[in-house]
Amino acid sequence: MIRIGTRGSLLATTQAALVRDALIANGHPAELVIVNTAGDQSSASIDSLGVGVFTTALRAAIEEGCVDAAVHSYKDLPTADDPRFTVAAIPPRNDPRDAVVTRDELVLAELPAGSLVGTSSPRRAAQLRALGLGLEIRPLRGNLDTRLNRVSSGDLDAIVVARAGLARLGRLDEVTETLDPVQMVPAPAQGAIAVECRAGDSRLVAVLAALDDADTRAAVTAERVLLAELEAGCSAPVGAIAQVVESIDGEGRVFEELSLRGCVAALDGSDVIRASGISTSGRASELGLAVAVELFELGARELMWGARSDRARGS
C-alpha cells in the first residue's frame, strides 16, 4: 500500500485523489493520509508565514516514514533543491491561468473604480494595480468555498483565484472571466501538482514516474528556474508561464519548442517588467535562466527590492 500524504483541504485531497486513483489504475494499491500544515493552522498571511508553509510538514511526514509520498501544489514547493527528496512525477497540468469571479457577472474591465477585489497573492495584486482600473485590492485567505462566499455575501465585489482550483472542484460555472496570460501572468507552476518521495526510494520513484507528463515537467522546470534565479519566493510578485508549442521550419516541417514568458511587478502596480524566450524542452533550465537574466538586465532586481521593502512596511 502506497501512503500518499496530503493537506486536508478539499482542493488538496481532490488533487491527491487523482494521484491515488492513477496509481490504483496502474495496479498499485494506494491511500491518502491527511497531514496538517502550518498554513492550514494559521489565519496569518502566507507571506508572513515564510517559505514552505504548506510543504514542510508533508516533507517531514515522508522523512519520518509516516507516508511514502506527498502531493503538493507545485507552486507551493520551495525552489531550493532538497537532496532528501525528489519530484518523481508531475502529472498533466491543469489550466494555469487566473480566473475572476464577480458578484454581478461583470468582467474585470467592467468593474467600477473602487470595487473591492480579493486576492491572496502579491503577484495578482501587483498586476491588478498595473491594469489601472482603480480597483481596491483586499487580502483573501481561507479555502475556496470561503473565498467564493466573500463574493456571494457582498463582502467583496470580485476575487481572483487560480482557474485550476475551480476546475478540480467542479466550480467553473462560478467563473466570470479567465484572464489571458498576457494580461495576468500566472504564478510559476500554477495549475501543476508535484508528487514527491524519498530520493533513495528507487522502486517508488519508478512507480510514480509512470504518472509523469514530459511537457508539463519541461514547462514548470523553466518557470521555476526563472523564479529561483530571481531568488524570489512563491509569494513574490513574479509571474512565469511556459508551454510547449508547435512551430514550422523553413521546409514546412512541424516541430515543438518551449516558450517562456516572465514578469516582475512593483507591488503598487507602477511598473511591470516583462521578458520572454524560446528554446527546446530539453533545455528548459537554460531557458528559465536566460529569461531571468533578461529580466535582471531590464531592472527586475531593483523592482523586487522595492517590493520587499513595501512588504516589510506592510504596504
From Swiss-Prot:
GO MF annotation list: hydroxymethylbilane synthase activity
Keywords attached to this entry: Porphyrin biosynthesis, Transferase
The record's free-text note on cofactor binding: Binds 1 dipyrromethane group covalently.
Chain positions found as S-(dipyrrolylmethanemethyl)cysteine: 234
GO cellular component, one term: cytoplasm
Pathway: Porphyrin-containing compound metabolism; protoporphyrin-IX biosynthesis; coproporphyrinogen-III from 5-aminolevulinate: step 2/4
Superkingdom, taxonomy of origin: Bacteria
Enzyme class, spelled out: transferase
InterPro entries in UniProt: HemC, Porphobilin_deaminase_cofac_BS, Porphobilin_deaminase_N, Porphobilinogen_deaminase_C, Porphobilinogen_deaminase_C_sf
PROSITE patterns reported in the protein's UniProt record: PORPHOBILINOGEN_DEAM
Keyword Transferase: yes
SUPFAM superfamilies: Periplasmic binding protein-like II (SSF53850), Porphobilinogen deaminase (hydroxymethylbilane synthase), C-terminal domain (SSF54782)
Function as written in the Swiss-Prot or TrEMBL entry: Tetrapolymerization of the monopyrrole PBG into the hydroxymethylbilane pre-uroporphyrinogen in several discrete steps.
Further details from the record: The porphobilinogen subunits are added to the dipyrromethane group.
Complexes and interactors: Monomer.
Protein name: Porphobilinogen deaminase
UniProt organism field: Mycobacterium leprae (strain TN)
Gene designation: hemC
